[in-house]
């Protein structure tokens, strides 16, 4: 690695320790030419995940955008920010574990709704109403019936 002081190659690692909650390694280095000490960080390179939107366009996955959508759906509900962050973590981990670099917005929505249905039914319905773009009351009522049927089946188990 080039020294930021003398720009010569060759440095030795003086100290290494975990950083960024274990997601990086902080290394103190010393230039073998001039003795200058400097710090470097080593991180895993995460492949960007592209979201294929309904209209066919692609955009980079934005964790914050997903978080905002779930926060909006769970507004004034007994769902804390830690629980919402955990939902976002689960969805993002699931998307990355599927492999590949592209995922449809539909799949993201399905993952979120599956988790939200178990966390808070009102937040689920709010999220579904935006995600599924209900055209009329019948479509909305069908979704409610599906949720109620699922709840009934779960209580029988």
Curated annotation (Swiss-Prot):
<keyword id="KW-0862">Zinc</keyword>
<dbReference type="GO" id="GO:0005524">
    <property type="term" value="F:ATP binding"/>
</dbReference>
<keyword id="KW-0067">ATP-binding</keyword>
<dbReference type="InterPro" id="IPR003796">
    <property type="entry name" value="RNR_NrdR-like"/>
</dbReference>
<comment type="function">
    <text>Negatively regulates transcription of bacterial ribonucleotide reductase nrd genes and operons by binding to NrdR-boxes.</text>
</comment>
<dbReference type="GO" id="GO:0045892">
    <property type="term" value="P:negative regulation of DNA-templated transcription"/>
</dbReference>
<dbReference type="Pfam" id="PF03477">
    <property type="entry name" value="ATP-cone"/>
</dbReference>
<keyword id="KW-0678">Repressor</keyword>
<protein>
    <recommendedName>
        <fullName>Transcriptional repressor NrdR</fullName>
    </recommendedName>
</protein>
<keyword id="KW-0805">Transcription regulation</keyword>
<keyword id="KW-0804">Transcription</keyword>
<comment type="similarity">
    <text>Belongs to the NrdR family.</text>
</comment>
<dbReference type="InterPro" id="IPR005144">
    <property type="entry name" value="ATP-cone_dom"/>
</dbReference>
<dbReference type="GO" id="GO:0003677">
    <property type="term" value="F:DNA binding"/>
</dbReference>
<keyword id="KW-0547">Nucleotide-binding</keyword>
<dbReference type="InterPro" id="IPR055173">
    <property type="entry name" value="NrdR-like_N"/>
</dbReference>
<dbReference type="Pfam" id="PF22811">
    <property type="entry name" value="Zn_ribbon_NrdR"/>
</dbReference>
<feature type="domain" description="ATP-cone">
    <location>
        <begin position="49"/>
        <end position="139"/>
    </location>
</feature>
<keyword id="KW-0863">Zinc-finger</keyword>
<feature type="zinc finger region">
    <location>
        <begin position="3"/>
        <end position="34"/>
    </location>
</feature>
<keyword id="KW-0238">DNA-binding</keyword>
<feature type="region of interest" description="Disordered">
    <location>
        <begin position="1"/>
        <end position="21"/>
    </location>
</feature>
<keyword id="KW-0479">Metal-binding</keyword>
<dbReference type="GO" id="GO:0008270">
    <property type="term" value="F:zinc ion binding"/>
</dbReference>
């Amino acid at each position: 690695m080039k020294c930021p002081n003398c720009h010569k190659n060759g440095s030795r690692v003086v100290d290494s320790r975990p950083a960024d909650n274990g997601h990086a390694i902080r290394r103190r280095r010393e230039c073998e030419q001039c003795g200058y000490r400097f710090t470097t960080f080593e991180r895993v390179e995460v492949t960007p995940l592209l979201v294929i939107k309904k209209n066919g366009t692609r955009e980079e996955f934005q964790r914050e955008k997903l978080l905002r959508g779930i926060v909006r759906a769970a507004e004034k509900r007994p769902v804390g920010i830690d629980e919402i962050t955990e939902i976002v973590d689960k969805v993002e981990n699931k998307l990355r574990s599927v492999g590949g670099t592209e995922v449809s917005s539909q799949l993201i929505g399905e993952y979120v709704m599956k988790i939200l249905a178990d966390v808070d039914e009102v937040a689920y319905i709010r999220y579904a109403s935006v995600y599924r773009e209900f055209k009329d009351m019948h479509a909305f009522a069908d979704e409610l019936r599906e949720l109620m049927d699922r709840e009934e089946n779960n209580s029988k188990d």
